[in-house]
């Protein structure tokens, strides 16, 4: 059967959420018979596979791909899903999130009408039940089509961190296969690398600022281990940054937006490390940044970063400890998250 869209869901121990995710695909107004659903289980140890198999018994268009060993990161299962996709268009979904019922109809119609390489929609952020709109851009336009490499302004506009997640988008599969685009399997920032490789190989990217088609859930204590803060995550994140920086080295445009936003994320991870790990991590940050001229707009992050670049490592670690205290205060953390997201809505 020829499907309009292949949907890829990476799964690891998602028994509490996977049914809701799958149901959001089954209920699409484009018609579930037009969808190929590929679920890649990353060696779950709970009953996620049993839940998926129960859906499989009812629907012929659900494929379950079982990895024999847990990869620890979502890159491998997503790339494996691409290998199994048979339709001309690909959509990604995280196992603890959902799509709005009309999402695929809107995305599919848009990519055909605009002849886009990929389409990006706006999304909701579910902050423990508080639904916040996350806008792509501050604009009154309902649809914007851009050539990513046309000029610096356009590239900067498309380089913001809130755009890089693979979900909330529809991709022309030919873009991915022709350019051998896959997710790195040994690092974090794998979605950033994938996004930018799609971006620099695209001639036409379409944004739907007024269409909120995806719900990103941020339930406290429910997100996977990649949302923790330890030296392994720090190293994996830095490795992913290096991969993407190397990918973009020949585009003849500034990559300051990518660098500044990801350095900010790296410094937040750094701030939550233990004392001995911080002593090692601060040197790695310095080595990565010492020959770069990165402008960081967030003042508190810029202050911390400047101490590192001046090799005032003890002071940088002290300041990071203060940031860690504030970040891990539940009241302050939730207030900041909600304020920051509402400010951009």
Residue ranges and their predicted role:
Residues 77-78, 95-209, 214-232:
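Donor-binding/catalytic cores of nucleotide-activated saccharide
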